[in-house]
Amino acid sequence: MVDEAEVARMIKKAKEGDKRNFTQTLEFIMVFKDIDIKKGFAINETVQLPKTSSPSTVCVLASGDMGVRAKNAKADMVVDADGLEKLGTNKRESRKFINRYDFFLADTQLMPVVGKVLGQILGPRGKMPTPVAFNAPIESFLERFRSSVRVRARASLSLSCKIGDETMDDADLVANAMAVYGTVEKKLPQGSKNVRQIMVKTSMGSIVKQSGTVA
């Protein structure tokens, strides 16, 4: 396991870098070892962060009652069946649309349509929607995904994800980093033994590496 005190040191060091005229994000980076990426190694996880500064954007693909409830719950966007079919007629607009949102939730009844019209674009981006049953509490799903980040590595021995921004307390950023680490570690063939290095950096800052190795 990685030491929380070491993660705290790295975050503190990263935040001490030069200030910019905008709020910089904090990125948590993991580098792996002893994994054969040719054997299909991939990570695509959704991690709910204990603390957040700005919510992730969530689009709901639903019609009828679920669509209404999603709108009432202030989903960033709600697209019904007709809207999906329309998106499917323009791939360029579909790509632009998909890039606007971090996560997608979809009524299970619409999943066949989603796969047909947007699957070829959503799939490679690791953004295939999470299915939601018609009678499920879409409000709870929205709350969870707004405080989540996507952690993804595909044919690569490293990954990077946002854990917050420089305005957040160090302790909150540490909690977020540990949540990401814990989720990824469980997906590695040999757990922490497959972690070569962890690093932290701000948007425009230098990379801060850990001291020693993860054991």
Swiss-Prot record:
Any one of the GO BP annotations: translation
Domain of life according to the entry: Archaea
Coiled-coil stretches: none
GO molecular function, one term: rRNA binding
Pfam families listed in its UniProt record: Ribosomal_L1
Keyword terms, alphabetized: Repressor, Ribonucleoprotein, Ribosomal protein, RNA-binding, rRNA-binding, Translation regulation, tRNA-binding
Gene Ontology CC annotation, any one: large ribosomal subunit
Listed InterPro entries: Ribosomal_uL1 (IPR002143), Ribosomal_uL1-like (IPR023674), Ribosomal_uL1/biogenesis (IPR028364), Ribosomal_uL1_3-a/b-sand (IPR016095), Ribosomal_uL1_arc (IPR023669), Ribosomal_uL1_CS (IPR023673)
Annotated Gene3D superfamilies: 3.30.190.20, 3.40.50.790
Record HAMAP family: Ribosomal_uL1_A (MF_01318_A)
Listed NCBIfam families: PRK04203.1
Function: Binds directly to 23S rRNA. Probably involved in E site tRNA release. Protein L1 is also a translational repressor protein, it controls the translation of its operon by binding to its mRNA.
Family: Belongs to the universal ribosomal protein uL1 family.
Subunit structure: Part of the 50S ribosomal subunit.
Name of the molecule in the record: Large ribosomal subunit protein uL1
Organism expressing this protein natively: Cenarchaeum symbiosum (strain A)
Organism classification: Archaea, Nitrososphaerota, Candidatus Cenarchaeales, Candidatus Cenarchaeaceae, Candidatus Cenarchaeum
